[in-house]
């Protein structure tokens, strides 16, 4: 399959779990997830050719990933840095999200995710991987490729 866009909470799970699976249960923002969820997430992502991110998601993950004490924080930040270096960034102007009709309901970042889903790069469409049920439904209604992570749990 083509590239996948991973939403904030799942990207946080991916980064924290990649640093150490034991950090998942230590991180307050990941209380609804466990190591099995991390394994499922890795399996789903492996089906795609690349992970694509937007700066807005990375800023959110950066702030959330730091909400744990050292030495875990340091290890997570190093893993996050490595991820940033390896993944593909697609810069989208905030105005693209603000101009979408979904902006008022979903906010800037999710509106930008939908905007990215609407793009077609050299015949390759982006798919969205999310744990946000409302966002998944909206993406599906718009005809975008979407995987609702909660359906895999």
Give, region by region, the residue ranges found by the protein language model.
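PIN-domain endoribonuclease scaffold, especially VapC-family toxins
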Residues: 4, 36-107, 115, 119-122
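Generic detector of short, locally flexible boundary/turn motifs and exposed helical patches
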Residues: 16-20, 27, 89-95, 112-113
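Residues that scaffold the ATP/ADP-binding catalytic core of kinase and kinase-like folds
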Residues: 13-14, 64, 138
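Acidic, PIN/NYN-like endoribonuclease modules and their adjacent C-terminal/linker elements
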Residues: 1-5, 19, 97-106, 114, ...
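Short, well-structured N-terminal submotif of metal-dependent ribonuclease cores
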Residues: 1-53, 68-72, 150-153
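Alpha-helix capping/helix-boundary segments
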Residues: 10-11, 57, 112-113, 134-135
């Amino acid at each position: 399959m083509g590239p996948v866009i991973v939403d904030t909470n799942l990207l946080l799970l991916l980064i924290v779990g990649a640093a150490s699976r034991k950090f998942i249960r230590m991180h307050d923002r990941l209380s609804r997830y466990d190591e099995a969820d991390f394994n499922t997430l890795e399996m789903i992502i492996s089906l795609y050719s690349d992970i694509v991110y937007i700066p807005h998601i990375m800023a959110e993950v950066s702030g959330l990933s730091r909400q744990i004490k050292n030495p875990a924080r340091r290890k997570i930040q190093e893993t996050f840095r490595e991820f940033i270096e390896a993944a593909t960034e697609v810069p989208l102007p905030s105005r693209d999200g603000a101009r979408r009709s979904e902006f008022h309901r979903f906010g800037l970042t999710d509106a930008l995710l939908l905007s990215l889903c609407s793009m077609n790069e050299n015949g390759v469409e982006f798919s969205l991987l999310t744990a946000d049920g409302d966002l998944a439904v909206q993406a599906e209604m718009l005809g975008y490729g979407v995987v609702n992570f909660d359906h895999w749990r």
